[in-house]
A protein has these predicted regions:
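Feature activates predominantly on carbohydrate-active enzymes
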Residues: 1-163
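A general structural detector for well-ordered alpha-helical segments in enzyme core domains, enriched
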Residues: 91, 119, 170-174, 208
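Structured, charged N-terminal subsegments at the starts of enzyme catalytic cores
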Residues: 122-130, 160-180, 184-188
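Active-site neighborhood of glycoside hydrolase catalytic domains
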Residues: 180, 185-208
Length: 208
């Protein structure tokens, strides 16, 4: 599926002169009324890296100017609204035109919130691998943990040493949601609160 799509996009780039990043570089596409090809011989080879992707980090420049994204469950700063699905679909198109195959669709994403789930859906619908932000082990950031506790009436700290049962419950809840997608590269590293410090600054250190 991806190979066929990349083949079509390669023809678009090489013979229709459509730049893979045309949506972002302000280069107008010149319409061609006809294209004559006497012979086409394009060969490609496997890339050295199996996963080639982009991480949409602090997606403030992709939202706010386009309605339809919906509210986010992470408050503060520019995290108050999600990127509209029509916008993320164009980002995914660019990713495919660049022959990439993996996307982290947002800085923080809570699949229990439909507007945020739409971002993951837009990626998965095009057959691309999904992955998670480096402070979202198994799809759960400290913010997602807080959302879960608030919504489902749970209490506890984002700390496996202090609250292992609730942490395992939250992880299981979100693993079930992420596992519904065919292609996921799982993040299993454990970070502290947010993105600015390691876990041992928030949790009790162990011998490990």
């Amino acid at each position: 599926y991806l190979g066929t799509m990349w083949g079509i996009y390669t023809l678009s780039e090489k013979f229709l002169d459509v730049d893979p990043c045309y949506l972002f570089n302000d280069l107008a596409i010149v319409k061609k009324n006809a294209v004559e090809l006497s012979e086409v011989d394009i060969a490609d080879k496997p890339d050295g890296f199996g996963f080639r992707g982009v991480f949409i980090n602090d997606e403030d420049l992709l939202q706010g100017w386009k309605d339809g994204g919906g509210a986010r469950l992470v408050g503060g700063g520019y995290y108050y609204v999600t990127v509209a699905k029509t916008v993320i679909e164009k980002v995914v198109e660019t990713v495919l035109r660049l022959k990439l195959n993996l996307v982290i669709p947002a800085t923080f994403i809570d699949l229990d919130n439909p507007p945020e789930k739409d971002l993951a859906d837009a990626v998965a619908e095009r057959g691309i691998y999904l992955s998670q932000h480096h402070c979202e082990p198994l799809g759960v950031s400290s913010f997602t943990f807080e959302n879960y506790c608030k919504k489902y009436g749970k209490t506890g700290r984002f700390s496996y040493s202090e609250c292992p049962e609730i942490m395992e419950n939250v992880w299981s809840f979100y693993v079930d949601k992420w596992a519904k997608y065919d292609n996921v590269v799982w993040q299993i590293g454990l970070r502290g609160l947010g993105d600015d410090r390691p876990i041992w600054q928030d949790d009790v250190p162990t011998e490990e």
